[in-house]
A protein has these predicted regions:
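Residues at or immediately preceding the N-termini of alpha-helices
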Residues: 1, 46-48, 86, 141
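Vicinal oxygen chelate
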Residues: 45-81, 102-116, 122-125, 146, ...
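Short, solvent-exposed beta-strand edge segments and adjacent coil->beta transition regions
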Residues: 36-40, 74-78, 129-133
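Core segments of cupin and vicinal oxygen chelate
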Residues: 1-29, 81-116
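Short hydrophobic/aromatic beta-strand micro-patches
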Residues: 42-46, 82, 135-139
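Extended, compositionally biased flexible segments
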Residues: 21-52
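Ligand-binding pocket scaffold of soluble enzyme catalytic domains
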Residues: 9-12, 87-90, 121, 138-145, ...
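Short acidic/glycine-enriched loop/turn segments that link adjacent beta-strands
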Residues: 17-19, 36-37, 105-107, 129-130, ...
């Protein structure tokens, strides 16, 4: 948690049971649960229900996403599912999303929960490890990469421009790969425009 607090400027609060939360002002940016490695993404739903594979949907206020305020520096601002073999139909069916294929390797998941469809998440075909990867808002991708190195993290993918905006992939000294996105205008960077 100290690494990401140093990179994103989070205020860290210790919770009972060895967990920690990272805050940007009055908004929760992340929670580190003792004994759980990597990032876990939570999607809000209309009502609690059981999903396949033991997953669940819970109600609650959306902290981050297309209907939340514009992401501040250090807050989650996008999420992508990195997979070798996409199964877009699963996510669309389980979460009530639409799928918009942008290219052979990339698709957008959209939700019309609160009006017209908005991008909620992306899916990228990759040969790297599979899973949900969070993006965090930063003022400068270049300066963030320098800070990552100063704190003994690694830059896995150097800064580059992708349809979402200017990004880089980074990882802390103890894991937790994520992507940093420079000054997103909304959830999903350029995808927030629609």
């Amino acid at each position: 948690m100290d690494f990401f607090a140093g990179v994103f400027g989070w205020t860290v609060i210790a919770d009972p049971g060895g967990s920690f939360t990272g805050w940007v002002g009055d908004r929760l940016a992340a929670q580190v649960v003792a004994g759980h490695g990597g990032w876990r993404v939570v999607f809000g739903g209309d009502g609690a229900r059981e999903l396949s594979g033991g997953s669940g949907v819970d109600t609650g206020r959306v902290l981050h996403g297309p209907w939340a305020p514009v992401p501040r520096v250090g807050e989650p601002c996008w999420v992508e599912l990195m997979v070798a073999e996409p199964d877009d139909g699963y996510w669309a069916a389980e979460l009530g999303w639409e799928t918009r294929v942008e290219s052979e390797d990339f698709a957008l998941f959209l939700s019309a929960r609160h009006g017209g469809p908005r991008p909620v998440a992306g899916r990228l075909r990759t040969s790297r490890s599979s899973g949900w990867v969070p993006y965090f808002a930063v003022d400068s991708v270049e300066q963030t990469c320098v800070r990552v190195s100063e704190l003994d993290g690694r830059v896995l993918v150097e800064p580059l421009v992708v349809p979402t905006g200017l990004v880089a992939s980074v990882v802390g000294p103890h894991g937790g790969e994520c992507v940093v996105l420079e000054r997103p205008a909304g959830w999903g960077g350029t995808w927030s425009a629609g």
